[in-house]
C-alpha cells in the first residue's frame, strides 16, 4: 500500500485524487491533507480518509476546522497557514505527495516535500515553470522521482518508456483550443468570464480553464516540458486537437510518432502518477475509437492566442523570466475572474510586465530571486492595470 499526502485536496486535482483513493482503498492510504479555504469539504475529507495531519492555509478558518474535527475518535495534527501546508508536505512516512495547489503557491510546499524525500506527483505545473532552476537540482540531490500528473506530460512520460536516451526528436503537445477555439478573433473583446469558463472537453478549476481559453496553459506546458524532458524550445511544438483524445505525442529520430490516447479524464494521469511503475486495473469507460469517429488537428493561431509566443519568449529568456510570466498570468487571470479586466487584457498585461522585467538574464536564480520576481510581477500587473483604469476614467469623463 502506498501512503500519500494531497496538497490542494479540496480543488479539482485534489478531489479527483481522493476519488481514486476511495476507489482503491487497498492500494493507497492518505497520510496528510492540505487545502486553502474550503473548510467544510476539508473537514468531510478528514472524516472520510482519516489522515494523520491536516492543514488549512486560511488562518481565519483554523478554529472552525478544529471544531468540526472535535468529534473524531482520533486526534490528527491540525495546522493553519502557509507553514502548515509546508508541514503537511514534508510529514511522516508518506511516500508520494500530490501537488494540486493552484499557482506558484505550490512552490515552497513542493520543495519541502522533496527535501523530506517524497516522490512528487506533479499536478501543479507552475511550481516547475517558476522554480525549475531550483527544483530540478533538489530532485537530483535528494534522489526522489518527479512524476507528471497532468494529462499532456503524463502522455509524454508514458510514450518515452523504452525510448533510448538520444531517440527523441521532438515533443508535440496537444491543445483542445479552449472555450473560444471556434470563435472568430474579432469577437474575443466581448466575451465574459462565464463564456471563458465553459470548456468544451475538460472539467477543471477556474484558473486553468481560463488559461486554456487563452492558450497560456499550453505555453506554460511548453516550459514545463523543457524542464521535465530536457528539450530545447525549438523541439517542443503545440498542435490544436479539438477532440482531446490524443493527450500528446513524441516524434522519434526515425520519424516514428508515438501517442497516448484516452478519454479526457484527469483521473487517468493521476492514477498513473500514483501507481507508477505499475498499471492498476480500472472499470472506467474504455476508449472506443469507432465512437470517437475521427481525430483532427489544426495549426495554432498565434494572432488569436498571443500567450503562446509570450511563453516561448519567457522560456528562452530563462532565469527568473518564466516566474515573472507565470505570476503576471496568475494576477491577470485573477483580475479577469473578478471582472476587472477584459479577456484580451490578459495577454496585454502579461506582455507589459515581461517587457519591464530587467534582470531576466540571471542564468541561475536562487529561490529568493524567484520569489522576489514573482512578487514584483504580481504588483506590476496591479500597477499597470491601475494606469489603464485611470486612463479609462479620464476618457469617460471627457
Curated annotation (Swiss-Prot):
InterPro entries: DXP_reductoisomerase, DXP_reductoisomerase_C, DXP_reductoisomerase_N, DXPR_C, DXPR_C_sf, NAD(P)-bd_dom_sf. Its EC number is 1.1.1.267. 1-deoxy-D-xylulose 5-phosphate binds at residues 125, 151-152, 176, 199, 212, 217-218, 221. Keywords: Isoprene biosynthesis, Manganese, Metal-binding, NADP, Oxidoreductase. It comes from the Bacteria. GO terms for molecular function: 1-deoxy-D-xylulose-5-phosphate reductoisomerase activity; manganese ion binding; NADPH binding. It is an enzyme of class 1 (oxidoreductase). NCBIfam families: Dxr, PRK12464.1. This is 1-deoxy-D-xylulose 5-phosphate reductoisomerase. The lineage of its organism: Bacteria, Bacillati, Cyanobacteriota, Cyanophyceae, Oscillatoriophycideae.
Amino acid at each position: 500500500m502506498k501512503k500519500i499526502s494531497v496538497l490542494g485536496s479540496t480543488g479539482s486535482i485534489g478531489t479527483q485524487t481522493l476519488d481514486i483513493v476511495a476507489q482503491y482503498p487497498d492500494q493507497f492510504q492518505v497520510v496528510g491533507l492540505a487545502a486553502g479555504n474550503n473548510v467544510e469539504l476539508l473537514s468531510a475529507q478528514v472524516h472520510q480518509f482519516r489522515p494523520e495531519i491536516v492543514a488549512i492555509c486560511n488562518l481565519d478558518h483554523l478554529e472552525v476546522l478544529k471544531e468540526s474535527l472535535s468529534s473524531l475518535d482520533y486526534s490528527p495534527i491540525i495546522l493553519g497557514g502557509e507553514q502548515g501546508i509546508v508541514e503537511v508536505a514534508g510529514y511522516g512516512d508518506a511516500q508520494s505527495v500530490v501537488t494540486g495547489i493552484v499557482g506558484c503557491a505550490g512552490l515552497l510546499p513542493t520543495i519541502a516535500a522533496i527535501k523530506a524525500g517524497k516522490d512528487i506527483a506533479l499536478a501543479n505545473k507552475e511550481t516547475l515553470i517558476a522554480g525549475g532552476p531550483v527544483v530540478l537540482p533538489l530532485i537530483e540531490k535528494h534522489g526522489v522521482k518527479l512524476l507528471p500528473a497532468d494529462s499532456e506530460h503524463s502522455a509524454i512520460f508514458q510514450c518515452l518508456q523504452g525510448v533510448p536516451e538520444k531517440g527523441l526528436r521532438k515533443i508535440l503537445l496537444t491543445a483542445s483550443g479552449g472555450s473560444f477555439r471556434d470563435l472568430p478573433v474579432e469577437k474575443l473583446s466581448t466575451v465574459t468570464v462565464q463564456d471563458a469558463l465553459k470548456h468544451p472537453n475538460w472539467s477543471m478549476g477556474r484558473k486553468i480553464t481560463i488559461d486554456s481559453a487563452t492558450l497560456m496553459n499550453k505555453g506554460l506546458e511548453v516550459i514545463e516540458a523543457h524542464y521535465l524532458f530536457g528539450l530545447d524550445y525549438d523541439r517542443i511544438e503545440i498542435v490544436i486537437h479539438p477532440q482531446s483524445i490524443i493527450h500528446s505525442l513524441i516524434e522519434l529520430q526515425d520519424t516514428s510518432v508515438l501517442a497516448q490516447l484516452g478519454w479526457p479524464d484527469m483521473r487517468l494521469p493521476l492514477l498513473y502518477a500514483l501507481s507508477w511503475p505499475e498499471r492498476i486495473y480500472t472499470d472506467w469507460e474504455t476508449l472506443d475509437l469507432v465512437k470517437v469517429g475521427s481525430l483532427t488537428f489544426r495549426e495554432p493561431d498565434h494572432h488569436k492566442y498571443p500567450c503562446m509566443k509570450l511563453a516561448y519568449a519567457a522560456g528562452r529568456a530563462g532565469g527568473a523570466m518564466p516566474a515573472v510570466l507565470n505570476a503576471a498570468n496568475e494576477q491577470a487571470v485573477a483580475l479577469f475572474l473578478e471582472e476587472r479586466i477584459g479577456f484580451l487584457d490578459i495577454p496585454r498585461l502579461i506582455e507589459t510586465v515581461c517587457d519591464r522585467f530587467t534582470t531576466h538574464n540571471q542564468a541561475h536564480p536562487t529561490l529568493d530571486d524567484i520569489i522576489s520576481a514573482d512578487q514584483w510581477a504580481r504588483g506590476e500587473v496591479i500597477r499597470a492595470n491601475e494606469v489603464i483604469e485611470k486612463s479609462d476614467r479620464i476618457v469617460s469623463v471627457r
